[in-house]
Amino acid sequence: YAFNYCFSQETQVFFNVNSWYNDTILNLGGYLMSNTILRNENVSVTLKSLGGELTSIKDASGTEYLWQGNPDFWSGQAPVLFPIVGCLRNGTATIGNSKTCSFGRHGLARKLEFTLVSSSETCAVYSLKADDSTKEQYPYDFELQMIYELTDHGVKISHKVINHGDIVMPYCIGGHPAF
């Protein structure tokens, strides 16, 4: 199951399943990855800074609703797809008269480290900002914010894309949760 949104300024997705915050640090394959856990009385979610990805949705009984990954098939849980959903023909696209974009399937966000901007027991905001490395692939001054907010029986996920540049910035955004 995947959902995609193209050229949107803000999108929201709700997952529902029938107050506590924790932050842990893991070092996986050279990445310094931070996990954030959000909890209320009915649901808990785990988020990781690598890719700003949701990695677990559990109800109060501990039932897991999100695919936990299997490298033999697919190791992801719910990657964020940005600035493209799917792939580009021949891996590149020219936008306007001179902007060339080049990246693999589903863009670049899922493989980059996000910064935890703010958090509480039931809400976390992760941010990915353009830098010299991202501009080599996607030549725009962007910021992607992932906002995760617990509801009574689920999690509300908001994608906020900010264009810090002065030219139009085409993009697609999507989520790829597996259940």
What are these regions (language model features)?
Residues 27-158, 164-170, 177-179:
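Surface-exposed acidic/polar loop and edge beta-strand patches at domain peripheries
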Residues 1, 5-7, 15-32:
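Short, Lys/Arg-enriched N-terminal segments with co-localized hydrophobic residues
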